[in-house]
């Protein structure tokens, strides 16, 4: 790693070396370079816990799997219950978080999954993780505030964050300013109606805890495969909670072939 960091230092300026040291290799703490000498030091205030044990299978946007619940656990130094005072008055929250499972460099153009993974568009016209500052923004539904001995917890639903993703900030969703029903979504518009038919035989489905069945089916409906992979003969696999789920996709139908308990 020392040789790699040394080569980066020789190729790019001092500001960018800070980016690679703190973001790419140590994503849990971050120093972002915002401009000419302007620095913002951020660190996680919380981590999210859920059944998305790997990025393969995580919904591509928040709200696509509303039945999946997650727990937000606050870090030491951010467990003061006063920080959550009156938060229960809001139905939805914004989460500012880091792409902790993204080890790639940012790119000026990216290939959105819903364009087949072939057409390139500008990174700022997408929600791709390959961004100059590796930050994500998601709207989740606040289900419950739990008082626990080790600090308050937030139970949320509809998150598109992998398990143990660092959260840097939490803000209330304000429908009178944040909602724009007449907004135009460009090439992302067809995603709203996209869903696969899921064939899940009773024998295999019975291996899944009943409380997790609907959530898993919803995840599969939105096609967890990488956009560039479309081989009907290939058996794909993804991990969800304590299970390995294997499946094939033909046209608009996803068929679960195996379920293994981890």
Where are these regions (language model features)?
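Arg/Lys-rich, positively charged N-terminal/basic patches that mediate binding to nucleic acids
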Residues: 31, 37-81, 87-89, 173-218, ...
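Short solvent-exposed strand/turn elements
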Residues: 150-173, 260-262
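Short, conserved beta-turn/loop elements at beta-strand boundaries and strand-helix junctions
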Residues: 53, 145-151
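Enriched for short, Lys/Arg-rich terminal
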Residues: 250-262
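Active-site-adjacent substructure of cysteine-protease-like catalytic cores
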Residues: 38, 83, 87-136, 228-230
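Cationic, low-complexity basic patches in intrinsically disordered or flexible, solvent-exposed regions
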Residues: 2-3, 25
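A conserved acidic, glycine/proline-rich C-terminal tail/linker
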Residues: 213-239
